[in-house]
Amino acid sequence: MSELSRRTVLISAAAVPLAGCGKNPANAPYVPPPAPGQKLVAAADVPVGSGTIVDGTLVTQPSAGVFKGFIARCTHAGCALSKVIDGAALCPCHSSTFGMDGQVLRGPAMEPLRARAVKVSGTEIVAG
């Protein structure tokens, strides 16, 4: 077996921490905001106390008939939120969770989700 050179050892040692600096595969590419009036989801498809993620927007219904919109990106590292379970939007990168009002339920995120204007148009939720 051949001995490793000092250079090979140093390069290998430096590469290990850098491996964690790459893009997280769960982090989806940038999604531009929807155009005003663009249909996002049927109001009936957003349960009270829950939400859905569509076109980079988290649409929630925190209470009956009240709809809110948020940019579906974690405020910690910018990862795309992956899903809504039991009234919480989940970040797959570092496990932050957000309530249906956009507030942080569990960190490491410290800032609430950024609002995105949505409104009801007939039976649809559209970009505001």
Segments (PLM) and residue ranges:
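N-terminal pre-ligand scaffold of iron-sulfur
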Residues: 14-17, 22-86, 112-128
